[in-house]
Amino acid sequence: MKDTARATVRIGFDGRVHKTFRGHFARERFEHEVRVLRYLEERGCTFVPRLLEVEPEHLKIVTTNCGGRVDHLQAERQVEIFAELEQFGVRHEDRELRNITYRIADGRFCVIDFEFATILDDGTGKPLTLTPSLST
């Protein structure tokens, strides 16, 4: 289990990932991550988690498991992985190794944690990013 100021993340016995948002702007981060994951699924991006359940009342999502953490990766390869994501119209704004996993089933590096990502074109030609309201 991962327990931080922004979220708790646990992997169930069935392998599914349960993420519950908390802390500053939790609702906005939850809604934005859901929006980004749905956007990527619509575009056929297969190296990100797929949403299985969305529980707005608990600020919780359940996703597929994208593999285990990566402890070492060449900087060039890390840049390539995040650049590949941009081909699907999303820029990851936290391009750290902690947001890359390795899925043994197909030998694929995957990207996780999209609460601060930017959708490069929201359909109007403008980018869409997390914009927390000051009222929360």
Give, region by region, the residue ranges found by the protein language model.
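Short hydrophobic-acidic sequence motifs that mark active-site Asp/Glu residues
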Residues: 9-10, 15-19, 48, 62, ...
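Acyl-donor (CoA/ACP) binding surface of acyl/acetyltransferases
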Residues: 84
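Hydrophobic residue at the +6 position relative to the catalytic HRD Asp in the kinase catalytic loop
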Residues: 95-102
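C-lobe/activation-segment region of protein kinase-like
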Residues: 75, 87-90, 103-136
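Structural motif
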Residues: 12, 55-57, 103-105
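Acidic active-site catalytic centers that drive phospho-/nucleotidyl reactions
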Residues: 33, 94, 113
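ATP-binding glycine-rich loop module of kinase domains
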Residues: 1-38
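Conserved structural core of kinase catalytic domains
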Residues: 22, 26-30, 38-81
